[in-house]
């Protein structure tokens, strides 16, 4: 009798536990499906998505539809790279109110005169933006932008509202401008205004690629088989009407990537045939690239949305690091110090930096920075 009572209680416990488990699963299934199952689905589909034309066909404009949106230039510099040998056309995506960020970039990695005199290369830096989104601040900010451009002549602005949901319009602005006014640039780079670019390392790299005559080149931090976010509370939410497939084509993080000049032309042409309502600009770049059969290459020292550790052994080969606003000028001073190159000189210097990079980059827990393989590059 006593044993029978224990069996009943045990069975009741199992029933209660099973009920709680099912209820919990029902409650959390949405997030689980969005974050885990969707990643599994998307990675399974990525080869199909990358290989077939039906994705592009579903997003292509119909013949009866008008082309991409047309916006007027409010500020423009058609002459910026006219009749010049331009190694790199550098677009910086910025917001109208981010004057301090633009100022810091002009004094560091975006400084054309520094690159010309110290690195023997010709780059053209342009800040791309729309109109101020706050109606109360719009007139004052616009006057300030006009004054700023009068001082520096490096702003390109069209009359769409500058917001997260218009990032693809900013993408179209960059490629339209490049195609119209600087088609001869050897490379094109697009970057956020809170990124750090190690310009000496990047220029050395691009000059070597130029000598090789590379084409069909697209490099950055690659996202493979990323799924659309279906959580309506996320700012990255994408509806099935906007994009119906379980995975995006491979693409590079929009924080910073580089393409060759021939790719810039092809991407612009592809962008004119696709529906630009998908507002995530780096994904839209992936769709354009998929249409022309271009595959992105991953570079260990492009951080994507990640932030790199602060250490001279990291600076030696770094290309980009994300999330630098307040410390940008200090990092520029430290990372471009000629002494950095001396740390890894010789056998013991190489061993020392190898150990440092393994400790900083090869951790068991996920770290959004350079991959572990960068420690051995």
Curated annotation (Swiss-Prot):
Q: Corresponding gene? A: B3GNT5
Pathway per its UniProt entry is:
Protein modification; protein glycosylation
Lumenal topology: which positions? 33-377
Q: According to Swiss-Prot or TrEMBL, what is its membrane topology?
A: Single-pass type II membrane protein
Q: Name one GO cellular component term.
A: Golgi membrane
This chain's protein is named Lactosylceramide 1,3-N-acetyl-beta-D-glucosaminyltransferase
Organism lineage: Eukaryota, Metazoa, Chordata, Craniata, Vertebrata
According to the record, glycans are attached at 56, 166
What molecular function terms (GO) are annotated for this protein?
Answer: glycosyltransferase activity; lactosylceramide 1,3-N-acetyl-beta-D-glucosaminyltransferase activity
Compartments annotated for it: namely: Golgi apparatus membrane
Described by its record, this protein's role is as follows: Beta-1,3-N-acetylglucosaminyltransferase that plays a key role in the synthesis of lacto- or neolacto-series carbohydrate chains on glycolipids, notably by participating in biosynthesis of HNK-1 and Lewis X carbohydrate structures. Has strong activity toward lactosylceramide (LacCer) and neolactotetraosylceramide (nLc(4)Cer; paragloboside), resulting in the synthesis of Lc(3)Cer and neolactopentaosylceramide (nLc(5)Cer), respectively. Probably plays a central role in regulating neolacto-series glycolipid synthesis during embryonic development.
Catalytically driven reaction(s)? a beta-D-Gal-(1->4)-beta-D-Glc-(1<->1)-Cer(d18:1(4E)) + UDP-N-acetyl-alpha-D-glucosamine = a beta-D-GlcNAc-(1->3)-beta-D-Gal-(1->4)-beta-D-Glc-(1<->1)-Cer(d18:1(4E)) + UDP + H(+); a neolactoside nLc4Cer(d18:1(4E)) + UDP-N-acetyl-alpha-D-glucosamine = a neolactoside IV(3)-beta-GlcNAc-nLc4Cer(d18:1(4E)) + UDP + H(+)
Which residues point to the Cytoplasmic side?
1-11
Which UniProt keywords are present, listed alphabetically? Developmental protein, Glycoprotein, Glycosyltransferase, Golgi apparatus, Lipid metabolism, Membrane, Signal-anchor, Transferase, Transmembrane, Transmembrane helix
Which sequence ranges are marked TM in the entry?
A: 12-32
Pfam families from the entry? Answer: Galactosyl_T (PF01762)
Under the heading InterPro entries, the entry gives:
Glyco_trans_31 (IPR002659)
**EC numbers, comma separated:** 2.4.1.206
Q: Give the species this sequence originates from.
A: Sus scrofa (Pig)
The processes (GO biological process) annotated in the record are: central nervous system development; lipid metabolic process; protein O-linked glycosylation
UniProt similarity note: Belongs to the glycosyltransferase 31 family.
């Amino acid at each position: 009798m006593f044993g029978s009572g224990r069996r009943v209680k045990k069975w009741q416990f199992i029933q209660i536990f099973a009920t709680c488990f099912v209820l919990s699963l029902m409650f959390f299934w949405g997030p689980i499906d969005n974050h885990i199952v969707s990643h599994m689905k998307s990675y399974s589909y990525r080869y199909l998505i990358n290989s077939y034309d039906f994705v592009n066909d579903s997003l292509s404009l119909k013949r009866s539809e008008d082309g991409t949106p047309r916006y007027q230039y409010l500020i423009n510099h058609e002459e910026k790279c006219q009749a010049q040998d331009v190694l790199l056309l550098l677009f910086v995506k910025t917001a109208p109110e981010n004057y301090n960020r633009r100022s810091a970039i002009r004094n560091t990695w975006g400084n054309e005169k520094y690159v010309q005199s110290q690195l023997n290369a010709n780059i053209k830096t342009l800040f791309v933006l729309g109109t101020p989104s706050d109606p109360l601040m719009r007139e004052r900010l616009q006057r300030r932008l006009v004054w700023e451009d009068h001082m520096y002549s490096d702003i390109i602005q069209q009359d769409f509202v500058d917001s997260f949901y218009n990032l693809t319009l900013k993408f179209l602005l960059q490629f339209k401008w490049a195609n119209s006014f600087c088609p001869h640039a050897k490379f094109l780079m697009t970057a956020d205004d809170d990124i750090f670019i190690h310009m000496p390392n990047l220029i050395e790299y691009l000059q070597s690629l130029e000598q090789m005559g590379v084409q069909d080149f697209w490099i950055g931090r690659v996202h493979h088989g990323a799924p659309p976010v279906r959580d309506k509370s996320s700012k990255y939410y994408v509806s099935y009407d906007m994009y119906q497939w379980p995975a995006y084509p491979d693409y590079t993080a929009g924080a910073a990537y580089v393409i060759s000049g021939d790719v810039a032309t092809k991407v612009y042409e592809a962008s004119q045939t696709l529906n630009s309502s998908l507002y995530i600009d780096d994904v839209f770049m992936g769709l354009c690239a998929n249409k022309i059969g271009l595959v992105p290459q991953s570079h260990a020292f492009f951080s994507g949305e990640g932030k790199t550790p602060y250490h001279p052994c990291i600076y030696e080969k770094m290309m980009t690091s994300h999330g630098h606003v307040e410390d940008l000028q200090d990092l520029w001073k430290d990372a471009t110090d000629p002494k950095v190159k001396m740390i890894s000189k010789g056998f013991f210097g190489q061993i020392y930096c190898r150990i440092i990079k393994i400790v900083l980059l090869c951790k068991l827990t996920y770290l959004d920075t350079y991959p572990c393989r960068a420690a051995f590059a």
